[in-house]
Amino acid sequence: MSTPSPQLLVAAAQQTLGMGKRKCPPRATCLHLAGEVLAVARGLKPAVLYDCNSAGVLALQSYLEELQGLGFLEPGLHILEIGENNFIVSPEYACQHLEQTLLGTVAFVDVSRSQPHPSVRSVDQLPDLKSLIADVITRFRGLKKDVSQGVSYTRLHSSDWNLCTVFGILLGYPVSYTFDLNREDDNCLTMTPLRVFTARISWLPGQPSILLYSFSVPESLFPALKNFLSAWEKELRTRFRAQNAFADLSISSEVVTLPAVAL
């Protein structure tokens, strides 16, 4: 796969994602999006959440097909719609990640307001989530069998899901928040020190780095979660070494305290 000029990547995004009354994404956003999509295709993350504007499934399908036509992507990426949110997914890598999640490689932090402080949960303590993950794996396995029909699309009904938890898993985080859906408007993270992890990679010369991951864990639980975080970093560095599209992987963390945390 070749890397088209930045001008072509920007044009592909603006011509497909900025149609009609939607505002065209700015140049920097277009290039960052292309980098994120390429990172998904190269197995550096299972999925990316599209949040540049209100473009829907058809526009995203056109965008990915345009990138394929430029020789930027191989066929195989998938669009997953959950509620009003759209993800660009690598079914192959997402399956691998979800299967590992069922084996306990991802930790969950319960931040329900009813608790005095956050606490760690395992996937085995969340049976409804286990069932949901298994269902998504089954759907993705079916998709991997045929990539010849253009960019495929799946819509999942999510009325009773904890979207915060599901999104964290799909985005490849080693730790995902969960909470009581009956009190979804609040949590116990207010004024709680959080360790925020970020992973960045370099791509186009002269352009800002690509933000690959950004997630947080309560600082008080960092010792209990360290093995999950170390395993995630090791796996990411292994996958990074196996590709040649990006350079300069940088993983860092800082502790912040916020008056309120929206999930």
UniProtKB/Swiss-Prot annotation:
Family: Belongs to the UPF0739 family.
Listed name of the protein: UPF0739 protein C1orf74 homolog
Organism: Mus musculus
